[in-house]
Amino acid sequence: MMLLTRSETILARNAPGVVKVLLSKPFQRAYSSFDTKRAAGSKVPGRGRSRALNLALVGGSSTVAVLLAYNFLSSGGQLASPSRGPISDIRSFHTQQNKLLSDVNRNSSDTLVLLSEEEVNRRLHAIQESYTVNRAKGILRYDVAQLPSNHPIEDNHIEQIVTVPSTRGVNLKGQENEEEDLYFFGIFDGHGGPFTSAKLSRELVSYVAKQLYPIYNDSVANNSDEKVRSSLFSKAIATSFLELDKDIVQGAFRRLVHEPTRENALTALPAISGSCCLLSIFDSEDSTLRVAVTGDSRALIGGVDPEGRWFVKALSVDQTGDNPTEVKRLKSEHPGEKGVIRRGRVLGSLQPTRAFGDYRFKLDAIDGKKLSDLPNDVRMYLRNIPNYLLTPPYVTAEPVITTTKIVPGIKFMVMASDGLFELLTNEEIVALVAKWQERYMPQNGSTENVSKQLPIVRDITSSSDADSQRTDFRYKEVKDSSGGGYLLEDSNVATHLIRNAPSAGGRKDYVTTLVSIPSPMSRNYRDDLTVTVAFFGNSTKDDGSLVVNHDATSDHKPKL
């Protein structure tokens, strides 16, 4: 573990031009060793330098601001020497008025407004949804929340129900029923722009439903044993992923090379940017949860074993250039190419090894026409071809699919973009949801017995899968020293996870600081965060309704 530490200095202005130091305390940012040479959490390449966070709170008559200084460190941990010194060209701005306040320090950085507690809460609650599902189909409630870092946010999501014919004629309660539900929950972690993730949120479910339709209308498939039917499901999901990506990339560029217009270049934006994809499908007929992952978003289930102990199990494996299985696959597909994986990235550039879009890792010509021959006014919309590109495609949208039977001990599923897992471990996530349940979904209807400590959670993920997952690395040393603290303030459980993620073990000052940093500066300290939590079970009502939990929902309409 390499720890980059600077100091946080709290200052106050007693009079114009007078600054008084009130106190100092450490503010730390930690990286695991494989992340110190590139931008933490970024799916695009860094500059080979890590940035340490140095802040000072500056008080004024009408505002409180946070001073951020970027110290560029070499891989050896020593201060680098840019042309103007390690910390240079520093100015102080009042961002509300966009005016120069003062030259607090010629060797510090821009001064940024530190949000009030009310403003922090407003930002955390700006994008959240929560619904109780009264369908007696195995899903009791789901919560979704987002916290942008990029502007606009590059993540997207989808929640949708597809009603399908029942193949057994009874529902979970043993009653006659001609229809069952497929619950779709998707998280799409975009990079290089929001265009690919937005397209996935609009179109992926319909592509999957189209491929699943023959299974429900084929008597042979309906009467097949569970193993055969599961294989048909997985094949249909994988086919839909590949078909959609083919339409996104090849379809767009085929139109572009045959008619190279600005309009066709703009319609190719979902092929130019990229997105990871995490899609979970819960089948109410047999309580089966299928998780398909393309990229490095992650799905977990949390539950209680017969002895009353909490457990977590990951249902997906991070597909990145740090995953030995993915590295082996790519090297076998491109034998003899030394640049296939460099610094943990595909062709030294892209962190996820599987993704939608990202045309430049998949083709350099189509129908015999090279993309480099496109007119200049069209190529200006495209991105540079990566170094070491010899035999594309290098990146695929083909998912890895897992199938899990949801039994009574399994309480909920958590899905999130990789930004959450940079800040929290799998065990911490389940412990935080379990703690939230004690207050907001108590089994006995009382909140009097809420314990003070987070529960102990065992990770039952297979060792091989666990070894392939990226571990939390941001602010780890501070979090470890905080003694397992947490914050419990949000009625939306997804927002609860997002609030705790940057808290470094329950520290409100970390939440305030990291939420206050605006885009694009914030991208150096946290990623876009998108979280979905679905609770398994059935509500006391069975009227087919979807009820908004208003205390946990901003002004959004349900998507199910």
Which ranges hold each PLM region?
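N-terminal mitochondrial targeting presequence
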Residues: 1-66, 72-110, 560
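Calcium-binding motifs, dominated by EF-hand helix-loop-helix domains
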Residues: 69, 188
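PP2C/PPM-type serine/threonine phosphatase catalytic core
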Residues: 79-184, 190-560
